[in-house]
Curated annotation (Swiss-Prot):
Pfam families given in the database record: ATP-synt_D (PF01813)
Keyword annotations: ATP synthesis, Hydrogen ion transport, Ion transport, Transport
Family statement: Belongs to the V-ATPase D subunit family.
GO MF terms, alphabetically ordered: ATP binding; proton-transporting ATP synthase activity, rotational mechanism; proton-transporting ATPase activity, rotational mechanism
Recorded name of the encoding gene: atpD
Purpose: Produces ATP from ADP in the presence of a proton gradient across the membrane.
Name of the molecule in the record: V-type ATP synthase subunit D
GO biological process, one term: proton motive force-driven plasma membrane ATP synthesis
Length: 211
């Protein structure tokens, strides 16, 4: 590791020692942050996998019901039915922080009665498969939202982990070793100069005695 290009003076030595203290403290804080980010990221990945399995299974079940309903009901009736929803759904996105990482949190707001009757239609032209399909699709919405929240948070935490890792490595393998080597070099130079000065004074003293 190449040392820094500085003058070997006591003032420079003092300045570099302060820099080393700051860099060492910063490295510890960043390493702690990296470890905590990884812990939360792993927990979120596990949650994401569990949610995805649930959502995919429920979507598959809902689509199966819908396919069966579509096979026995009038196609025009189904198209008209799904053209206009029975209830307006509102989505609010707010920002929250996880270890100084801004992540979006989506809030899903709708009438709870929508889950019981997501679409307004009579039962004369319907069948049980259609009822089950719409009920399942409506019940999936909160889980889809939760899945979107978790996946976006995982994505942002992953980027922050990589950025923090680069900073930790830069301090650990470049900045701190450079400072340590430069400090060692200055200390050796100062000791060398001090020994040279002592030798010079001894010679002067010996010459004065001879005279």
């Amino acid at each position: 590791m190449a040392r820094l290009n500085v003058n070997p003076t006591r003032m420079e030595l003092s300045r570099l020692k302060k820099q080393l203290t700051t860099a060492t403290r910063g490295h510890k804080l960043l390493k702690d942050k990296q470890d905590e980010l990884m812990r939360r990221f792993i927990a979120l990945v596990k949650e994401n996998n569990e949610l995805r399995i649930q959502v995919e299974q429920e979507v598959t079940d809902a689509l199966s019901n819908f396919v069966l309903a579509n096979a026995t009901l009038n196609e025009a009736f189904i198209e008209e039915l799904v053209a206009i929803p029975a209830e307006k759904v509102e989505l609010e996105i707010i920002e929250q922080n996880i270890l100084s990482v801004p992540v979006p949190k989506m809030i899903f707001d709708y009438d709870e009665s929508v889950q019981e009757a997501p679409l307004d239609y009579g039962y004369v032209n319907s069948n049980s498969e259609l009822d089950q399909a719409f009920a399942k699709i409506s019940s999936i919405l909160p889980k889809l939202l939760a899945l979107a929240n978790v996946e976006k948070t995982c994505q942002l935490l992953s980027k922050e982990i990589e950025k923090t890792r680069r900073r930790v490595n830069a301090l650990e393998y470049m900045t701190i070793p450079q400072l340590e080597e430069t400090i060692y070099y200055i200390q050796m130079k100062l000791e060398e100069n001090e020994r040279g000065e002592i030798t010079r004074l001894i010679k002067i003293k010996s010459m004065n005695k001879e005279n």
